[in-house]
């Protein structure tokens, strides 16, 4: 939503088996076009339909699958969201393995995105050290643990329909950081 608000023409490809993004887009509130890909073949096929967009974002499941691997192979930037939880970071390791394998044919830029950040949490420091060990850079911006993110999902809105200036601000800063990767 933040990229569309900044004037970019955005497409989002939903590869998550839950199809929550696809279902949300049916409410008519999406500020971008949504495509659905239920298989790795769909991911490769949709790519040709995305040429007219400034950015195409692939939303996937948090676990490694054939479709996740296909999404990595067609991506220019892979954002790996992780929470300060050992189990969450362990699951992200499989995506890093796919990125390393993909580097033999075409290097794909990747960044970790820390979500549900609680500033003084001990696990946050452990997570930051674990990220360093992978060789994949983290974004400077992290998404803080905020109730507005959950409320927005439950209400079928984006955070930009809320009055939470701090949440909107961190999403806008993250968006600028993502765009900068492509400059």
Task: Give the residues covered by each predicted segment.
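P-loop/Walker-type NTP enzyme "switch/lid" segment
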Residues: 1-69, 153-161
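Structural beta-sheet core signal
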Residues: 12, 58, 80, 112-114
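Inter-motif core of Ras-like GTPase G domains
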Residues: 65-85
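Conserved C-terminal guanine-recognition region of P-loop GTPase G domains, centered on the G4
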Residues: 92-107
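Beta-strand-loop-alpha "switch" segments that mediate conformational coupling across diverse proteins
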Residues: 118-120, 128-157
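Inter-lobe coupling/hinge region of RecA-like P-loop helicase motors
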Residues: 149-172
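Short, hydrophobic alpha-helical segments
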Residues: 178-183
